[in-house]
A protein has these predicted regions:
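Compact soluble domain cores
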Residues: 1-65
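Enriched for short, Lys/Arg-rich terminal
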Residues: 79-82, 86-101
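Basic/aromatic recognition patch in beta-strand/loop cores that engages polyanionic ligands
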Residues: 61-87
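Functionally constrained cores in energy, signaling, and assembly domains
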Residues: 31, 72-73, 93
Length: 101
């Protein structure tokens, strides 16, 4: 999938609330640290654009037949979040969404 395709898939998935969000401790910790709601995260991810991508498509080392896309974008003033997604089974899977390190 090309970058434009993943952006369109992300926007559609967020609009339809049809996505899988992996609940890692790092994802939860960043959300709580900044007082962000699930709605805030959905809006943020839906706002990703082509210029926010830093890597991708690239092969998922754990699942070589799948592609990953990595984004970085400011979510609130002076705070960038790292977002890693893949498109699997006609659905966006959000693997990471946390403060950039």
């Amino acid at each position: 999938m090309e970058v434009k395709g993943i952006i369109n898939a992300i926007k559609k998935s967020m609009k339809d609330k049809d996505y899988d969000f992996v609940p890692t401790s790092k994802n939860r910790s960043s959300r709580h640290k900044y007082g962000l709601t699930q709605y805030d995260i959905e809006e943020f991810i839906a706002s990703l654009e082509e210029e926010d991508i830093i890597k991708g498509p690239e092969v998922d080392r754990d699942y070589p037949d799948e592609e990953l896309f990595i984004f970085k974008k400011e979510i609130i003033k002076d705070v960038k979040f790292y977002v890693k997604v893949k498109y699997k089974n006609n659905q966006i899977k959000i693997i990471s969404c946390h403060e950039d390190e």
